[in-house]
Every structure is written in C-alpha cells, then in structure tokens.
UniProtKB/Swiss-Prot annotation:
This is Large ribosomal subunit protein uL1. GO terms for biological process: regulation of translation; translation. PROSITE patterns: RIBOSOMAL_L1 (PS01199). GO terms for cellular component: cytosolic large ribosomal subunit. NCBIfam families: rplA_bact. One of its GO terms (molecular function) is rRNA binding. Gene3D superfamilies: 3.30.190.20, 3.40.50.790. Part of the 50S ribosomal subunit.
Length: 235
C-alpha cells in the first residue's frame, strides 16, 4: 500500500510542473518557494550533454570560478615545500605541508574539500591515489590543482572555483550556491558554469552539446529550465 504524501511533498508536486521548462528566474523562485526544511539547502544543477561519455575525447573535465561562490568555506590542503609554504598560507590555505600532511590524510584524520600540489611533490602525493582518487581529490594539472603558482590556485578555490566533470551518462552535476542567495546571484553562477562548459566543448564534437538544464535543492525536486532564458548562447 502506498503511503500518503507528506505536506511538503504535496506542495512540491503542486508547485512544479515537470512538463514545463521554466524561465530561469521563475525556476529559481520556485525552488525558494518549495524550500521548507530547517537548514539552508544547496542549489544544484544537472546539465545533460550530448557527448558520448564512452569516448575519452568527448569527456569533459574543467573548473570555473563562480562569481558569487557556493555559500560555504572550502577547506584547502596544499602539498608543497620551501617558499611555497608561506605563500600558500598567506593565500588562505587551511593546511599546508608535505610528509605531515601526507600522514594526516593517509590516516584519515583530515578530509579537505580540495587538494592542491606543486609539481615537485607529486611523487609524494601520488602515493595517496587510493584515498584521494575515489573522492575526486587527486591533484590534476588540467583542473588547476597541480600548479607552479600555488598562491593563485589557492585564491581561485577560496574565491568560488568549482571543479566539474561528466558522469557515465554525460551529465554534469554541480552546486551553484545556497537557497538563501538572491535570484540574480544564482542565475549568474549558473550562466558562468554554462559559459565554462561551452569553452570545454570537444573541438570535433557535432550535434546538440547542451541538451537539458535542470535545477534542484538538496531535498527538493528537479525543475527543468528553458535554455533560451539564460543570458548565454547554449549551442
């Protein structure tokens, strides 16, 4: 026997029509209207791409600085040595070191959101592959987390840089802020992500690149967005 829908679930069902693609500001306003939990939810997006995720040359992996951040402090660990230690600390890194930091992460005493490394210490960091890899934290040159300019990399992350990559279905999942952001902030963050996605489009790709854009909150249902309402050219 099917249980009764909660008051919140009924409200979400009645508010959002899954057959409609909402203008982005209307969709974001709906998310705010449906937010009824007792914590500040994240606002997430799922962007369906037309790529074939089975082909390595079509996979997307990139980063972007969201103009308004994501609404929480990002804990950054930096593997480096020498003068870079002071530079990383001054840039706002939460934990900086080499062997001591290696031990903390290996023993699971510290769980950073982002790990950055200078190239000269990657021989140490690579040993943490079994721990960092599954969590998507292994420093990577393309993602800007292996860098000669440690201070700049830390500042980028602290100022709202997010990393993204497509899943096996060719979908990009990313957080674009908190439900207590104003509508324009959320819209501009979403648009910044889409601009970055366009820049990461495979050179030889043909066809519709961005097929569908949906938004949701941590505990809410998805709302489909009319791509034409965004202030960027989608394809």
């Amino acid at each position: 026997m099917t249980g009764k829908l909660s008051k919140r679930m009924r409200m979400m069902r009645d508010c959002a029509d899954t057959s409609i693609q909402y203008p982005v500001l209307d969709g974001l306003e709906l998310l705010k209207k449906m937010a009824r939990v007792k914590f500040v939810e994240s606002v997430d997006t799922a962007i369906n791409l037309g790529i074939d995720a089975r082909k390595s040359d079509q996979n997307i992996r990139n980063n972007v600085i969201l103009p308004h951040g994501i609404g929480r402090d990002i804990h950054v660990a930096v593997f480096t040595q020498g003068d870079n230690i002071v530079l990383a600390k001054n840039a706002g890194a939460d934990l900086v070191g080499l062997e001591d930091l290696y031990d903390q992460i290996k023993n699971k005493n510290y769980r950073p959101d982002v790990v950055i490394a200078s190239p000269d210490v990657m021989n140490v960091v690579s040993k943490l592959g079994p721990i960092l890899g599954p969590r998507g934290l292994m420093p990577n040159l393309k993602m800007g987390t292996v860098s000669h300019d440690i201070a700049e990399s830390v500042k980028n992350v602290k100022s709202g840089q997010i990393r993204y990559k497509n899943d096996k279905s060719g979908i990009i999942h990313a957080t674009i802020g908190k439900i207590n952001f104003d509508l324009i902030q959320l819209k501009e963050n979403l648009e910044a992500l889409i601009v970055s996605l366009k820049q990461a489009k495979p050179i030889l790709y043909k066809g519709t690149y961005i097929k569908k854009v949906t938004i949701s909150t941590t505990m809410g249902r998805s709302i489909s967005i009319d791509r034409n309402s965004l202030c960027v050219v989608i394809n």
